């Protein structure tokens, strides 16, 4: 009961003002204390993000997902190692995904 009351008081005293509030708790003398901790300001529209890979609060990949975007990212997962991410042009060589990043690294065998 005290926790609920303290949360209500904290939210009333520290209303949402464009930044995210995390409620932390600690046990002091067997009384549960709850206090707000201000965290990073969210970009405009982050809470309404419709990107299927993006956690709208953290703007990072959702739990269980690898990536949000990039040439080696598809459906929130890294593409398999050896997948062509940049086709060769002229005398150039193809670039391939590593399977551990959404970036497309330059082929190390290029001159």
Swiss-Prot record:
It is found in: Secreted. This is Disintegrin CV-11-alpha. Its main location: secreted. Expressed by the venom gland. Disulfide bonds join 53-76, 67-73, 72-97, 85-104. Residues 1-20 form the signal peptide. Coiled coil: none annotated. It comes from Cerastes vipera (Sahara sand viper). Gene3D superfamilies: Disintegrin domain. Keywords: Cell adhesion impairing toxin, Disulfide bond, Hemostasis impairing toxin, Platelet aggregation inhibiting toxin, Secreted, Signal, Toxin. Heterodimer with subunit beta; disulfide-linked. A motif (Cell attachment site) lies at residues 89-91.
């Amino acid at each position: 009961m005290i926790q609920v009351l303290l949360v209500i008081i904290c939210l009333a005293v520290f209303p949402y003002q464009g930044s995210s509030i995390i409620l932390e708790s600690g046990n002091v003398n067997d009384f549960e204390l709850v206090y707000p901790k201000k965290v990073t300001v969210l970009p405009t529209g982050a809470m309404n993000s419709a990107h299927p890979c993006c956690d709208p609060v953290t703007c990072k990949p959702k739990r269980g997902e690898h990536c949000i975007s990039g040439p080696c990212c598809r459906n929130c997962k890294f593409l398999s190692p050896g997948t062509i991410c940049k086709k060769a042009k002229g005398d150039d060589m193809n670039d391939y995904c590593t399977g551990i990043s959404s970036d497309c690294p330059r082929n190390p065998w290029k001159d």
